[in-house]
Amino acid sequence: EEFLHHLEASLPVASDEEYTSAKKPLNIVDLGCGNAYLTFATYSFLKNTKSMDTNVVGVDVKRQSKEHNEAVAKELGWERDVSFVQGTIEQAEIPGSENVDVCIALHACDTATDQSLVRAVRWKTKLILASPCCHHDLHVRIKKSVTSSSSSSSSVLLAPMTSIARHGILYERTIDNVTDAWRALVLRILGYKVDVVEFIGGEHTARNTLIRARYTGAKATKELWDEHDAMVSSFGCESYLTEALKKELESRRISVT
């Protein structure tokens, strides 16, 4: 329910006559949909509550999830508007991917969140709602940098990180936040307006961060690039997302005057 409130508040097209008059359906992709609880809830909310013509595609790597979800959609009479694709987030072929309006990724583990962001960016998605889960990849990358730099003073930031890295729970929480801050920064450079918010109470799950990004096409500023370059130099590594979107990022850097 809380997620749907954020979706409603975030929709760049919620009051757009182009959609509400049914001249054009709102196209949504749910990456890593699992048993599609969110997929069906999103469709029902937009179609039945908001009266918006909506198409939703759920993507999951498991064939059994696809078959189960298709059966549920048929039972509900929604099979025309709600469909499912089996495949990885990186490689699944999405029908109508050139017209994706909203991309959802709820609790995609580790780099699956990054892979979802990559696909959303390359689809030029208008709205991205991603709730990250575990953050192992950057933990490993930064820990390697901390270890290799422990006897060096080359980085102002890595010195205190050595102390934090001694305590697993402190290191985990710190790098979780660094990971999501870096993701938000990359999206800003690529022309998105980004908010990072809590979308459900912490008593339900500790994984309650929502990255909410709306595409505006805003130009990447020198200040944003300075922040990005400081992240790389301070932590001594790239993130998964900066490597995956290297081409897109560099094209934005060239445009900075």
Label the predicted regions.
Residues 35-51:
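Conserved SAM-binding loop of SAM-dependent methyltransferases across substrates and taxa
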Residues 6-22:
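Glycine-rich helix-loop-beta junction characteristic of Rossmann-like nucleotide cofactor-binding loops
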Residues 31, 40, 131-133:
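Short loop/turn segments at strand-loop or loop-helix junctions that form parts
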Residues 24-34:
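Conserved class I S-adenosyl-L-methionine
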